[in-house]
Amino acid sequence: METSMETVIKKAEILIEALPYIQKLYGKTVVIKYGGNAMINEELKTSVMEDITLLKYIGMNPVVVHGGGPDINKALDKFNIKSRFINGLRLTDKATMDVAQMVLVGKTNKEIVSILNQMGGKAVGICGIDGNVIECEQYKTTIDGQETDLGYVGKITNINSKLIELLAKDEYIPVIAPIGIGKDGQSYNINADTVAGEIAAALKAEKLMLLTDVPGVKKNKDSDEIIPALTSAEALELINKKIIDGGMIPKVLGCIEALEKGVGRTHIIDGRIPHCLLLEIFTNKGIGTMIMKEKILYYEGEKL
């Protein structure tokens, strides 16, 4: 009986720990980039959707930007279309673009919307073509000293955030597929991390949350210990020291750019951990790496 009562008291303490964060974030926008293993594993998918629904119910304005690489790969295999990647970006010809748009907008987006709605949320699925939310141009990159394009891969030129704001500040949860629209009316596939960062900046979001398949930024290459909080300057120093490397570099640089454009805090968290969003947002220590312009506490009990 005593053990049972201790458990109940512990649960109450956890709820009280969340109180200052709920107070700080009430009415604020939180942009969540949903991707990685959390999109594949059904239990993780459920826990992320529960977290997002709860954020809305306690007064925050969650905005979801999703990837869909695994779904796209499955569809391309069905159509016998082979994928090629250059510098981590999918080389997207017309056939690949048609499949990517069909999958991201018609399948992945609607599945997320459906799950959120089943949990009591009011999710609305859109892509960047709707209301010209994501305006873009063809992305160019340099390969062997020569500028080249990657087909129908887009570079964002403007975010028209009014539609997202109208939905998020009302009772709805916007769920956004990373397809943009060019001046010529052509649709383009855009990296979901990039879309999430630009939307967070346009909305002046309090938080940008990137769900990944890694625990966060490690103290060094030989350590499993995660750095809970970094300033932008400290993160850049770790890149220069090659402690942050590989696929983590564009994620960290995207976080820093979002901070420069007005986002309050950015987070790189492990989407493989159940209820990762709640654990990162509402606990003093968090579970991943938070990147800020400066280390400013939300309240005195916060541990950075």
Swiss-Prot record:
Protein's cellular compartments: Cytoplasm
GO molecular function: acetylglutamate kinase activity; ATP binding
GO biological process, one term: arginine biosynthetic process via ornithine
Keyword hit for Transmembrane: no
One cellular-component annotation, GO: cytoplasm
Catalytic activity: N-acetyl-L-glutamate + ATP = N-acetyl-L-glutamyl 5-phosphate + ADP
Cross-referenced Pfam families: AA_kinase
Main localization (coarse): cytoplasm
Keywords from the named record: Amino-acid biosynthesis, Arginine biosynthesis, ATP-binding, Cytoplasm, Kinase, Nucleotide-binding, Transferase
PANTHER family named among the record's database cross-references: N-ACETYLGLUTAMATE SYNTHASE, N-ACETYLGLUTAMATE SYNTHASE, MITOCHONDRIAL
Protein name: Acetylglutamate kinase
Lineage: Bacteria, Bacillati, Bacillota, Clostridia, Eubacteriales
Gene: argB
